[in-house]
Amino acid sequence: MARIWASEAVADGGSAGGRVPPEVQRITGYLRMSAVSGIGFAVLFGAALVLLREAPGLGVPDSAYTAFYRDGGGGVLVTIGLYVVPFAGIAFLWQLAATRAVLSASARAHQSPPEIPRLLQLASGVLFVAMLFAGSAAVGAIALLGSFSVDPLPSPEVARALAATGYGLLFVFGVRAAGMYMITTTTLARAVGLFPRWVAVVGYLAAAFLLVSTTFHPAILLVFPIWTVLVSVVLLVRAGSPNKPPSH
């Protein structure tokens, strides 16, 4: 990234007069967009996770499912959580698009990102959102029935099966997609000098943890938004100091 700004400054006659080249302004805008949308995704995702966790877990007895939905436990918290999830996904798609725009701009500075990681980054990001939507819908399906249907609710066995489906989509497939997104984004950003080395190390370690983890504890779902916040802060710093090379 420093190479991009340096080449643009030379092409525009340096920083004489304090005028920022248009290309640098555009890339800085992409950096801010990626950072702001990334922080927005992390906040919305965390709020949705807290709300959806009000639903009974897989290890509780059938009586807990019956009591929870009979007493209206899913009427507010779980339903609101489901409505927050789409906005978290939308914010993440903005972050994905803005990040890819920054990486694409680096190609014009004679530093083309590798094509395979770029394709994998796009695929894993979209797959993560798909798993997030599908898994959340499965976990909150009974809560939606309780809020909008006049028919009797399904049996606890059905509720448990839907919850297990949602957990599988989120904790097995969604978590792995998030890990792959972290690996590819870190690789591409490091190749163009966007991330300092320590951020790359943190990203690779966190991604490896997501890829090999077998736990269904909800805390694992927080690894990805925490990494997103870290990356967003780095991008905001980069956007505020476009002429400063990345630290090593």
For the regions a language model picked out, list residue spans one by one.
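Hydrophobic, aromatic-enriched alpha-helical segments typical of multi-pass transmembrane helices
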Residues: 2-248
